[in-house]
């Protein structure tokens, strides 16, 4: 059932969401080849230059044919946030609408989709000294202990943040210590929702087994394409280290540990696939709470009929 209300003359925005390894890029490219849409990437790892294989980044040839915004905009030494993504995406949406085209936001970073659709409240800037202290406490006691502390002051945030998600635990505790208010309270205050009608399509595999097969196949393909060499080149840079957000991306942290001698290649494969499965599980949990979905599709259904479905939506049908 469609929840998007299309008014004549109101420019829409399209969302193409789904867990990892469900073919979102292929579907987005197919739409861009057939319809007047322009792709905006919604992926916290694709923003980084030099991280191509482990992110399944579209090839240079494909990007030349079908441009994607918000890919290769940062160096891996830099941090990126949901707030910055929202600002960048809104600017891109305005430009695409001004050109008479339709923005297609495609990816799997669910926090970015939420920030764009529902807005973000004003949050304090990062405090380097406080972050160093929290990292020191985590080194001494583990991120699980800090997650327990977060549960005491912001149970809502703790419920949605994985106990191993160091970056988000750190940020939630930082906000609490800087403001005396929980991240959840601040995020509910003063949000500005997206002002355009949204057509929202979600890709979801038919079964967990099929998704796991897709994930294993893709990770093996990444290894065959030179993923280890890609991380080795990044690891040689003196300004990059394992704790950076870019290097904590799924797959990259496992290859980094392999290069540190923590385990052998077969264990790398097992851990990389397991980490990707866990990532997909979190994405699916998030998606199941998503509201206003125009249609849920399997990858096969999307491949066979998504352009026609989106075309009907754009024509008001």
Curated annotation (Swiss-Prot):
ATP binds at residues 18-25. The keyword tRNA processing applies. It comes from the Bacteria. One of its GO terms (biological process) is tRNA modification. Its cofactor is Mg(2+). Residues 43-46, 167-171, 281-288 are annotated as: Interaction with substrate tRNA. Its EC number is 2.5.1.75. GO terms for molecular function: ATP binding; tRNA dimethylallyltransferase activity. The record marks 109, 131 as: Interaction with substrate tRNA. Substrate binds at residues 20-25. Catalyzes the transfer of a dimethylallyl group onto the adenine at position 37 in tRNAs that read codons beginning with uridine, leading to the formation of N6-(dimethylallyl)adenosine (i(6)A). Monomer. Belongs to the IPP transferase family. This is tRNA dimethylallyltransferase.
């Amino acid at each position: 059932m469609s929840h998007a209300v299309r008014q004549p003359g109101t420019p829409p925005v399209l969302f193409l969401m789904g867990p990892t390894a469900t073919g979102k890029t292929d579907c987005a490219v197919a739409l861009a080849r057939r319809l007047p849409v322009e792709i905006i990437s919604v992926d916290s790892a694709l923003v980084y230059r030099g991280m191509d294989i482990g992110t399944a980044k579209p090839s240079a040839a494909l990007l030349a044919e079908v441009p994607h915004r918000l890919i290769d905009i940062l160096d891996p030494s830099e941090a990126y946030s949901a707030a910055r993504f929202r600002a960048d995406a809104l600017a891109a949406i305005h430009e695409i609408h001004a050109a008479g085209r339709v923005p297609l936001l495609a990816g799997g970073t669910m926090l970015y989709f939420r920030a764009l659709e529902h807005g973000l409240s004003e949050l304090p800037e990062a405090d380097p000294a406080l972050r160093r202290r929290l990292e020191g406490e985590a080194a001494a006691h583990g991120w699980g202990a800090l997650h327990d502390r977060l549960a005491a002051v912001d149970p809502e945030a703790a419920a949605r943040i994985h106990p191993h998600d160091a970056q988000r635990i750190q940020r939630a505790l930082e906000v609490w210590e800087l403001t005396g208010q929980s991240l959840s309270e601040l995020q509910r205050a003063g949000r500005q929702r997206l002002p355009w009608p949204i057509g929202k399509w979600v890709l979801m595999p038919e079964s967990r087994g099929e998704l796991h097969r897709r994930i294993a196949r893709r990770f093996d393909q990444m290894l065959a394409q030179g993923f280890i060499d890609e991380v080795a080149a990044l690891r040689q840079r003196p300004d990059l280290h394992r704790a950076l957000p870019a290097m904590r991306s799924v797959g990259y942290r496992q290859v980094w540990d392999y290069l540190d001698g923590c385990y052998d290649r077969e264990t790398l494969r097992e851990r990389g696939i397991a980490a990707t499965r866990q990532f997909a599980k979190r994405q699916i949990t998030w998606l199941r709470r998503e509201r206003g979905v125009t249609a849920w599709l399997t990858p096969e259904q999307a491949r066979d009929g998504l352009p026609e479905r989106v075309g009907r939506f754009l024509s008001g049908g």
